[in-house]
Amino acid sequence: MKKFAIIVFSLLFACTIGFAQMANPNDPLKNDPAVRIGKMDNGLTYYIRHNAKPEKRAEFYLFTNVGAIQENERQAGLAHFLEHMALNGTKNLPGKTMINYLESIGCSFGQNINAGTGVEQTSYMLNNVPMLREGILDTCLLIMHDYAAFVINDPAEIDKERGVIIEELRTRRTGQWRLFEASLPYLYKGSKYATCNLIGTIEGLQAFPAQELQDFYKTWYRPDHQAVIIVGDIDVDQVESKLVALFADVPAPATPSPKKIIPIPENDDPIIGIITDPEANSTSVDFLIKSEMIPFEMRPLGMMYLINMYKAFVSNMMNDRFEEIAQKPDAPFIGAYLYFSPISKSCDATYFSLSSKDGESLPAFESLLLEVEKMTRFGFTQAELDRVKTNYMRRLERAAENTADRKNAEFVSDMITHFSDKYPILDPVYELEVAKGYLPFIQLDQINQIAQQMITPENRVVVVSSPEREGVSIPAADQINEAFKKAAEAQLEAYAEEVSNEPLVDASSIKAGKVVSEKDGVFDSKIWALSNGVKVVIKPTNYKKDEVIISASVDGGTSVVPVECVPSIENNVFSLWSQNSGVGNFNATALKKKLTGKIANVSPYISSYSSGVNASGSPQDLETIMQLIYAYIVMPRFEASEFEAPMAQIKAVVPNLEKNPNFTLQRELMKTLFNNNPRREFISSALVEKVSLVNLEKAYRSCFSNVNGMTVTIVGNVDMAALKPFVELYLGSLPSAKQPAKWADDGALIQKGKINNHFKVVMETPKTSIVNIYSAGIENTLQNQVFMNSVKSILDMAYVKSLREDEGGTYGASVQAELDNRPLSQGMILIVFDTDPTPEKQAKMRQIVEADIMNIAKDGPSEEYVSKTKENMLKNRQENVINNNFWNNALKSYYIDGLDIVTSYDDIVKNISTKSIGDFLKDFIKQGNFIDLSMNPQE
């Protein structure tokens, strides 16, 4: 198999003499010196790092270099099953002892206590654990220790978990999942990966002997395959001492079973797969070229980093070209991209992927191949390379700026890849210096040679995925082969570069407004009132050195838009239009080029009762961010040619989504909740037919024609003196009327009374989905918000125990608790879950759901659940207050909704009780509003 990276080595080797010594790519790169890396005598590896963001918190991971690929033919799905069993009892923490303990200190199942299984690895994690006392550290180490070698795997618990995992299979086995499984025999032809099944089959999960699971655990879970990772506000020396002493009894195997690297066979002729599914969301083509992986011993070298820089530049330039094509009105594909990624431990790949309109996968693939052919024949331009270099370095500069502000979780992935794949753990400041040393030596001719070398005639795989629907044509294998020949013989012209040098916004033509008053605001903020009626609330922070977040909101939204215009600003339509439209004289492609080297993310929105702009970026690009906010409000683009591409995307996807049972469930939920209110119409083919650019423009200009009453919140590392002229120029000049903008009561309230909606749909994987909704008119206060969040937390715990653990009837019930203040204050508690479609199981599950919530309303929740909820809410608040996003939301809540979510929060949480929650829920339910919605398989 072609060693793509080795070829790159040879192309670059001649240049290495010119590198400065500090940047010599033949030398190994340095691991972050703050990371303590050790290996015990039994083979266990550990990584420990101190970091105090957030304070008094830590991450604990056990990474096991074992996954589904280690299963034999009798063990399909057992690597994943084992992950579940680790949470069901260990030697030192039997039963639910571990989860109960962690919940008692504020952790929650799913958010802070979780695990994940892949083909190659399994991870167990405890996230954001409060380090309030030494005993918590000791217990978390004990949990990792028991995961590593002392999971009980009790046969009785295994039998109880079978139902949970079978229901997980029902939930996960969507059309996209089935297409993924169907693609494996083509992607991995001739290897074990071709039949590797992450979750198993219903029949296998029902019948496997407990001994098989115990054998898998004993064979593969051993210290030479494992790494313990601990990052947080801890003493590194203390943790290392405790870890080494505790894990000393984890036995190294006397006769270890070797973990083999499984090869993927080469192929001279393209392997071509054509796969379909009735519930597929879209048509796609994946085209990959396999190559050998870089040997482990080469991965720590600077040369490996340099190769990855080359790959990043090639993929970014190619993806910019694909994006430019996709935005054209006659685009041959909806979207396409190139990336480089291993498909196994033994096989790397150059990966092209596209999505197309149904029935047009062949012409889309032919167009993609022509672009690939252009790349190999003509290469890239110097302007393209300069842009991606600038953006790459700007990203690294920002990471270096924010080095001291990284959260604990941000360190973990680099430690995992160091253990599993031998890549170095780079400190961002050091990485920036390395990249600076390499950058001058990356030349266009080398880039273009690499682009040529990565496209080879052998080891190609093409997988076409399509909805299985009457009238949708799919290509044959010989047509795919013919497409390769046509591209190779095509008459082509090199890519032509177009760049505009005009300013994004002509500041000289703008009449600035003025700050007419200044005063102190809440939460250490400052308030500037502008001459056009805009209120600007600024909170300077140092939570992240290179970050600023801005939100602009004015009343109105869809509530004041003519009803016939509402479909044209439906969320999906509006989002795709704004992404493809650009601003002023810049279409989307030109705008992206104009913003080279800038960290400025700005997007307009129109919601039910307000419209505005959300923005984030770097403080050094603050003027650019302000210019974009101004441009989206004053200089939007409504070009018919630019509207065709997003509409083509929507028209291609929506008909397929309508065949998806989960989509149907969401549609029926919205219809039932709001009694078919036309201002809450869920996206559908019928809605798409009502969309027009004329109505979109009419609605948009209506929403943004008057900023009087707009509230703009600015949070982050901002200099007030530097900010003020930008605010006066770009915000003070926005159009306003004499009267502030208002929102209107659109009548979109949750239906009252008792309502049933039971329906059937055709589905490939039979399951029943049940949604129960309680609603009530309640005042939007912080006290009630805390009660709603408490009810959600308590019901989550109750249903994990009753529906999942005791009944084994679902993978999980999702509980949502929402409180809105427009058009009227109204709360909603929503419970949704999937289960076995038999009538008996449905009836039992419904009975449990109702009994749990009614018992809590009658008698109040248990003291245990209340205590766990309070600890979790207080813990989460402590973590959130060091984020700019939290304070941006707090300021918006205060100055737009009149609600202080900060000052009394801790006191309110500490004072909730079994009685107060029970009384709240009782009053909520007794209003008598209940929706029972269910989706069953059509026979």
Language model regions located:
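Short, structured secondary-structure elements
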Residues: V119-S123, K160-E167
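M16 family metallopeptidases and their MPP-like homologs
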Residues: Y47-R49, P54-E71, G77-A79, K96-D146, ...
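Hydrophobic, small-residue-rich alpha-helical packing segments that form membrane-like cores
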Residues: R162-E212, F216-H225, I229-V231, V236-L243, ...
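Proteolytic maturation boundary segments
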Residues: A20-I48, D235-M309, V314-E323, Q327, ...
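Non-catalytic, conformational "gating/processing" segments within enzyme and secreted inhibitor domains
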Residues: R162-G163, Q176, L213-V244, E458-R460, ...
